[in-house]
């Protein structure tokens, strides 16, 4: 175990970062989307384990529109995003106020924008589900909505919630199920094909601010609610497998590490990044941030990243 204050690598940008996403696809896993006040930027990062040194390239900027007053709250790359084809194929959804903005680009000649409207309030999270056939979104309007993105784009399913929707997640091994987390602490696994809830669990505390679904084991889900990180094993869903009290503050985001054999969880509490092995109360890593603009794991290499004002910071985590 080690505690780290300073990041191993950083990207200095010219404006404050509102949120970002690192692509998880096999053919674009170093692609990063960054949201600023009025535009998005696509970056390609190089990590020392692959390219010998750390660096990045700014590939393209995309305008959010002058009229938009709300900042981007979530970003998600579609599963068919690839930099290993000709032409390149990048599809990115940005949650911008109550709208979903769908950008498609080949990073060269062609860029298009499609706007999906239907939510009545701020969208908190977006995720591609059903192997990329549908886009899912959750909002302060107490709904989870599913959208087709071909043609004009259509809201084909609406799943009513009892409080604001905070997180929506898919799983590569179970593409027809979606994790939907509500602010009052209820987490549903929803079968999109059957249009019904399969199982629900409830956090002992609320408000719930974030939830995630472990890619390394689809039976494990976690939430950050009321200052606790609560993890469930869905084989025994009625009692949490682990409750970790991390702070009186309710926190901001929680994420499982994608490739670790043991459950490793990262979170941002206030302006502190913490990484824990699931059963441990001693952090593997702890670092201070100047502002909050998101947090994400790299899909292939053991790096956790987070925003601090105008910087995107990377820490290497020692994991099993």
UniProtKB/Swiss-Prot annotation:
Effect of a null allele: (Microbial infection) After infection with E.chaffeensis, results in reduced bacterial replication rate and increased survival.
Annotated transmembrane regions: none
Keywords: mRNA transport, Nuclear pore complex, Nucleus, Protein transport, Repeat, Translocation, Transport, WD repeat
WD repeat boundaries on the chain: 67-113, 118-157, 160-200, 203-242
SUPFAM superfamilies the UniProt entry points to: WD40 repeat-like
Biological processes per GO annotation: mRNA transport; protein transport
Location(s) in or outside the cell: Nucleus, Nuclear pore complex
Domain of life: Eukaryota
A Gene Ontology term for the protein's cellular component: nuclear pore outer ring
Record InterPro entries: NUP37, WD40/YVTN_repeat-like_dom_sf, WD40_repeat_dom_sf, WD40_rpt
Function statement: As part of the nuclear pore complex (NPC), has a role in its assembly and function. (Microbial infection) Required for optimal replication of E.chaffeensis.
Record protein name field: Nucleoporin Nup37
Record organism: Drosophila melanogaster (Fruit fly)
């Amino acid at each position: 175990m080690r505690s780290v204050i300073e990041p191993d690598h950083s990207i200095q940008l010219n404006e404050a970062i509102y949120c970002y996403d690192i692509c998880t696809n096999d053919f674009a896993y170093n692609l990063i989307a960054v949201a600023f006040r009025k535009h998005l930027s696509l970056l390609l990062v190089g990590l020392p384990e692959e390219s010998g040194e750390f660096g990045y390239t700014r590939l393209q900027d995309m305008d959010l529109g002058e009229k938009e007053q709300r900042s981007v709250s979530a970003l998600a790359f579609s599963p068919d995003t690839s930099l290993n084809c000709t032409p390149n194929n990048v599809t990115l959804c940005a949650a911008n106020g109550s709208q979903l903005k769908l950008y498609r680009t080949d990073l060269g000649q062609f860029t298009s924008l499609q706007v999906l409207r239907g939510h009545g309030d701020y969208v908190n999270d977006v995720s591609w589900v059903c192997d990329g056939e549908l886009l899912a979104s959750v909002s302060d309007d107490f709904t989870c909505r599913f959208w087709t993105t071909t043609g004009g784009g259509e809201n084909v399913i609406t799943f009513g919630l009892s409080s604001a929707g905070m997180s929506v997640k898919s799983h590569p091994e179970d593409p027809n199920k979606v994790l939907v987390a509500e602010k009052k602490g209820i987490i549903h696994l929803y079968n999109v094909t059957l249009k019904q809830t399969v199982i629900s669990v409830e956090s002992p505390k609320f408000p719930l601010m974030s939830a995630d679904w472990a890619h390394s084991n689809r039976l494990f889900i976690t939430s950050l609610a009321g200052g606790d990180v609560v993890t469930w094993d869905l084989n025994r869903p009625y009692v949490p497998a682990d409750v970790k009290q991390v702070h009186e503050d309710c926190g901001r985001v929680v994420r499982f590490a994608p490739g670790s054999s043991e459950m490793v969880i990262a979170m941002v509490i206030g302006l502190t990044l913490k990484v824990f092995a699931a059963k441990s109360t001693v952090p593997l890593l702890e670092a201070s941030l100047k502002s909050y603009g998101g947090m994400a794991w790299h899909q292939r290499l053991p790096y956790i990243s987070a925003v601090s004002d105008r910087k995107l910071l990377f820490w290497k985590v020692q994991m099993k």
